[in-house]
Amino acid sequence: MKISKTISALILSFILILGSFGTANAKRLTAAVADWTGGEITCQVAVSMLEEELGYKVKRVVFPSGTGLWEAIAAGEIDFACESWPSYAEADTVMMKGPLVYDGETMFNYEGDGSVKLLGTSGIIGLSDYYIPRYAAESLGIKSWEDLNKHKAKFATIETGKRGRLLACPVAGWNCHDQKRLDLLGIDFQADELGTEAAAVAEAVAAYKRQEPFLLYLWEPHWFFGAYDMVGVGLPEHKVCDPDTFTEAGNWKDCGTKGWPATGWAKD
């Protein structure tokens, strides 16, 4: 029996469900390692349990998140992904079928074709926001995202001109849509995608050491907050944009609900 077309939101649920395949003939699996730090740790734990406790041999492949990953799982080229943030995976709505449940509460019902299966969640709750150093928040008097425009010059660079700069969600394939969110909220900042989590964090660390103001997309839990004193600007809660008005053809300008794009829940 081959475990295929399967994705786990987070590892613990994956391991528990995988245990039911204990009599499987095929003992080799291919795992997609997420391209962010937490995902790498998640996969290390999952693979260790599969190999040391269940006798599988697991080949790990670093695979960028996004639609391509889901398609590879659906095609059987990859057996499972160790971790996925569901509200950042736009392909899930067409590939998964069934409820997404957190703490006994149904957050979303997928109505896709079922080519990718969600095995469950581990109970880890993630939160994404835009963060600034506490020293900048206190010196500039920034208490929420609504205060950012008043001080955008402090966050501007030669490349952004008069606009402030956001060290954005670094990978386009993560589908964060930071520039769309900034524009919908009227925040006059430019989202700068640096390509990797490491690059974005390195630039933030350098700015912190220089005691410069900067705005950073990041998520919790993350090791960065244990090393540096940061404050979230408190982005608004998730709202679903009207699919008839919030379109690529319309340059994603009209959300229909005056909210931010459907890419981040308070709980993820």
Can you name each region flagged by the protein language model?
Residues 9-19:
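Bacterial N-terminal signal peptides
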Residues 36-37, 57-71, 192-203:
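Short helix-initiation/N-cap motifs at beta->coil->alpha
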Residues 37-56, 180-182:
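Short, polar/charged alpha-helical segment
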Residues 87, 97-117, 181-185, 191-268:
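Flexible, solvent-exposed loop/hinge segments that line or gate ligand/substrate-binding clefts
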Residues 106-166:
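A conserved helix-loop-strand patch within extracytoplasmic ligand-binding domains
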Residues 1-11:
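Bacterial N-terminal signal peptides that target proteins for export
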Residues 26-38, 56-62, 163-167:
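Short, well-ordered beta-strand elements
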Residues 66-131:
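N-terminal segment of the mature folded domain
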